[in-house]
Amino acid sequence: MLQRSVSYFKSLHATAALEGLGSHVINPLQAASMTGNKLFAHMILEKAGVRTPKAVAAFSEDSAMAALEEFGYPAVIKPVVGSWGRMIGLLREKDAARAVIEDREHMFPLYHVYYFEEFVQRPPRDIRAIVVGDNVVAAIYRYSGDGEWKTNMALGGRAEVCPVTKELEDICIKATRAVGGQIVGVDLMESDKDGLMVHEVNNTTEFKNTVRVTGVDVPGLMVDYALALNKG
């Protein structure tokens, strides 16, 4: 069974139900759970030795501000569950951070889990690589839109072909195995200081722009992989 719901909560619960009925789901529940939560994903990637941005988590307004003082500015605040660049903010100094955190104290409890990442100095782009099984089948550069520091295509970014180097393939496969995935999208940054680092692994990765730019039949490769597993 190939899980394709882009909703974290729907895909998580549907996968649990399908596995409970005896189905093999791509990706399995453990992978869906780990990749859909940025804090969980960070912990498992770091434990596996995958280069990933430094991060810190806090669970109250005061501890969040204290964590940022130690962590340093600028910092990036992200919801632990979310997509398409929504609710992600760049905190450049203390007053801005306090305003954002005070607002989140009045939101849904999920937003009371404060997850911060270092602001990585990088070119104005990131990389989306599609992993199917043990292969990186395609990759694109995602460039920031006008006036944006985020590279999400949903925010007006543009895409170009990214060559799949051995370094890129190695880190993507390592990240995929760390989370227990089979078909994933790995998002990476090219740190000026540390080179390639993984900042997200996507459980039900989107691929429209990857297909458009690279010409690779990503959905066909996904289906072929699932059918081959079923025959095996």
PLM region descriptions:
Residues 117-118, 181-193:
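A short glycine-rich, hydrophobically flanked beta-strand micro-motif that places a catalytic Asp/Glu
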Residues 1-10:
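Short, structured active-site "lid" loops
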Residues 13-17:
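A short acidic, amphipathic alpha-helical/loop segment
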Residues 89-179:
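Phosphate-binding site of ATP-dependent enzymes
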Residues 19-22, 26, 30-115, 121-124, ...:
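Active-site nucleotide/adenylate-binding loops and adjacent lid/helix of ATP-dependent enzymes
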Residues 177, 190-232:
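C-terminal active-site "lid" helix and adjoining low-complexity regulatory extension at the edge
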Residues 75, 115, 137-138, 184, ...:
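Protein kinase-like catalytic core scaffold
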